[in-house]
Amino acid sequence: MIDNTFTLISRIDGEIRRFITEELAKEGITDIVPSHGAIIVELMKHGQLPMNELARHIDRTPQTVTSLVKKLVKSGYVETGKAPEDNRVTMAALTDPGARLAATLCRISEEIYEHQYQGIPGDEIVVLRSALARMHANFAENGFKDTESMG
């Protein structure tokens, strides 16, 4: 059976990424990509995190997170340092510019939420999210683990 579910998901993903990029550009932020957003938001929610824990939170490999965090450090949004109790552990935390970026990303996320569910009743949103979560789990259960950076 051929259906266009993947095509629709891919198009929505592209539209959301484009919207995020355009909204960031309006704020003068051109040095990050949407995939950095997950790191910024997790650090906003949890404060300072060990890099390996951050990787688990955003479902990426430690290598991918290291690469993304290095870019955020270079841009001044994140700082890293060794954990006081174990110098083998690298911690990541938002800087002041990173906290401002997090607030901007939250505003953009709210706008996306309003647009993506416009005209869709709440009970249908619940069903949609449940089906998408199950689809994601199906891939994970069958060895299709998402391990690559998306940006």
List the predicted regions and their residue ranges.
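A short alpha/beta connector and helix-capping loop motif
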Residues: 136-144, 148
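A cross-family signal for key residues in well-ordered alpha-helices
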Residues: 10, 41-42, 103, 129
